[in-house]
A protein has these predicted regions:
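A conserved beta-strand-loop-helix scaffold within acyl/acetyltransferase catalytic domains
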Residues: 14-116
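Short, flexible helix-coil linker/hinge segments at the edges of structured domains or between repeats
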Residues: 1-12
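Active-site/acyl-donor-binding loops of N-acyltransferases
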Residues: 1, 64-67, 71, 77-102, ...
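A generic structural signal for short coil/turn motifs at secondary-structure boundaries
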Residues: 40, 121-123
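A short, polar/charged loop/turn motif at coil->beta-strand junctions and beta-hairpin connectors
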Residues: 7-8, 107, 166
Length: 176
């Protein structure tokens, strides 16, 4: 599989520890900034703004479902999946909701693939990053959802043998 071929090619694919998240998230920021800058609705933010946003993620992330790929010590790609908390993260933090958050983090039914980015130089690395996520979700008897993947992109094939259902969505705009 592609995962092994990238490891054989000298890539290190790992999950960061919680204490490494601040540094790792800044590396993700740099790569994300470069990769997404040509997206139509992209808006640049500072690394400080990004850190404030992503620092909060450390409390709800299952770091085993975050994959970082390094080539010669430089971040080449990342995949961030998290348990599907639904609207729970937006609700008031009562003791009951806090217990539900911890339960969902520990025993999720579904994982959401939130962010995926790969340096253009390393095409195919995204599939290598997705593979252990889908395998781990399968082992935990959970599903993994890659949200809003465009049909004409290569990402629709990631971990194809592990994919189950596929749903099609339309995105429409109405000028008023």
């Amino acid at each position: 599989h592609r995962f092994e071929s990238f490891e054989e090619a000298g890539f290190t694919i790992c999950s960061p520890k919680k204490k490494e998240w601040e540094e790792a998230s800044l590396q993700v920021f740099e790569l994300l900034n470069r990769l997404y800058q040509n997206f139509p609705i992209y808006r640049s933010i500072s690394s400080q703004q990004f850190s404030r946003i992503f620092q909060k993620y450390q409390h709800i992330l299952d770091f085993s479902m975050v994959k970082l790929a390094y080539k010669e010590g430089k971040l080449a790609g990342f995949l961030i999946a998290m348990p599907d908390y639904g609207s729970l993260v937006y609700q008031k933090l009562t003791p009951l909701n806090l217990a539900k958050l911890f339960w969902t983090k520990r025993f999720p039914k579904r994982y959401m693939i939130m962010y995926l980015g790969v340096d253009e130089e390393f095409l195919g690395l995204g599939s290598a990053l997705a593979y252990p996520i889908f395998k781990e979700a399968q082992k935990r008897q959970a599903s993994a959802i890659g949200a809003l993947i465009h049909q004409k992109t290569v990402t629709r094939h990631y971990a194809a043998e592990l994919q189950g259902d596929k749903h099609e969505y339309g995105l429409f705009e109405l000028d008023l």
